[in-house]
């Protein structure tokens, strides 16, 4: 007997048992990073960072740190790119990809919060939750300890909690788009760091410019004026207030508070980015180390 095919379009209500996939994805991502670190990133870092005729002294602290930073950014770039492609491949054919009203209605007579979730959309959520679960342990035992260690740890823990809550409370359609618009800009941030460590200043500058522009367009324009507008206004007439007298309003207010908090964070980090960008351009003509070296790493807390 062969393995039955996976029905990616199969719909079901979110269940707590679905979270069993999170540790599996966390272990999977750990294994993938370990293999890439050992057989790809290490070799790539030595080849790109150090000249062929330059003797690489791994005993020096600076050399080891630079390679570790390169490998961390390379891994994050790979993850965010894969997460972005996965989210887009799953959502771009859905009616709610182009019409935010369809976050809350359909298919058929389904109306939020009584909406089932396709198996492939569940995959997007479990993949993201698995990454942030893995990141909690990687931050503690694997990655370089930075000055923002505490903030990063809180960020990863809260990310897992918020992804889980939004899944159970059936905000998965909105959440998948929020994940996609945030992961997109992070790809260019990590690419800029890799380029900086490798000495490709022009590519680093271009990557950071795209990162800043995509941040502004996706997080400061599309996110508040389309996503938050929908979660604040479009959903209201769709909710059956008699059937969901308590849980409907509770979910509405709790998650809109969280989503607007995310907007505040996006604005805060944008102001920091803008100031640093202007300062670096005026002083050096290009973005320097302190913007992309790892001391600048804006957080993303998904809904």
From Swiss-Prot:
Top-rank taxon, per record = Eukaryota
What's a GO cellular component annotated to this UniProt protein?
endoplasmic reticulum
Q: Which UniProt keywords apply?
A: Endoplasmic reticulum, Lipid biosynthesis, Lipid metabolism, Membrane, Transmembrane, Transmembrane helix
Subcellular location field: Endoplasmic reticulum membrane
Q: Which residues form the TLC domain?
A: 68-282
The Gene Ontology terms for molecular function here are: sphingosine N-acyltransferase activity
Please name the Pfam families in this protein's record.
TRAM_LAG1_CLN8
Q: Which GO terms describe its biological process?
A: ceramide biosynthetic process
Using the UniProt record, give the first listed, main subcellular location.
endoplasmic reticulum
What residues form the membrane-spanning segments? 12-32, 77-97, 124-144, 149-169, 208-228, 253-273
Keyword Cytoplasm recorded = no
InterPro entries per the UniProt record, alphabetical: Lag1/Lac1-like, TLC-dom
**Record carries keyword Cytoplasm:** no
Membrane topology type: Multi-pass membrane protein
Cystine links in this protein are none
The job of this chain, per UniProt, is described as: Mediates resistance to sphinganine-analog mycotoxins (SAMs) by restoring the sphingolipid biosynthesis. Could salvage the transport of GPI-anchored proteins from the endoplasmic reticulum to the Golgi apparatus in ceramides-depleted cells after SAM exposure.
Q: What is this protein called?
A: ASC1-like protein 2
């Amino acid at each position: 007997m062969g393995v039955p095919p996976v029905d990616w379009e199969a719909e079901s209500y979110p269940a707590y048992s679905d979270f069993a996939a999170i540790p599996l994805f966390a272990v999977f991502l750990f294994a993938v990073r370990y293999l890439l670190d050992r057989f790809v990133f290490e070799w790539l870092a030595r080849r790109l960072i150090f000249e062929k005729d330059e003797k690489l002294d791994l005993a020096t602290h600076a050399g080891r740190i630079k390679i570790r930073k390169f490998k961390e950014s390379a891994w994050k770039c790979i993850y965010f790119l894969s997460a972005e492609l996965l989210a887009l491949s799953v959502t771009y054919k859905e009616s709610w990809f182009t019409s935010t009203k369809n976050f809350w209605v359909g298919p058929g007579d389904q109306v939020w919060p009584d909406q089932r979730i396709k198996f492939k959309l569940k995959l997007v959520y479990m993949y993201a939750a698995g990454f942030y679960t893995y990141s909690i342990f990687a931050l503690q035992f694997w990655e370089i300890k930075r000055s923002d260690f505490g903030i990063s740890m809180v960020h990863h823990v809260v990310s897992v909690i918020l992804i889980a809550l939004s899944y159970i409370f059936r905000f998965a359609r909105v959440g998948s788009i929020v994940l996609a618009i945030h992961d997109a800009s992070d790809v260019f941030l990590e690419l800029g760091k890799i380029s900086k460590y490798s000495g490709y200043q022009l590519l680093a500058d271009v990557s950071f410019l795209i990162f800043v522009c995509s941040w502004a367009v996706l997080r400061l324009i599309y996110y508040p004026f389309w996503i938050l507008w929908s979660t604040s206004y479009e959903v209201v007439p769709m909710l059956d207030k008699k059937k969901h007298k308590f849980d409907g309003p509770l979910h509405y207010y709790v998650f809109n508070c969280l989503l607007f908090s995310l907007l505040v964070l996006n604005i805060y980090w944008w102001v920091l980015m803008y100031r640093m960008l202007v300062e670096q351009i005026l002083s050096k003509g290009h973005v320097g180390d302190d913007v992309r070296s790892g001391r600048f790493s804006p957080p993303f807390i998904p809904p």
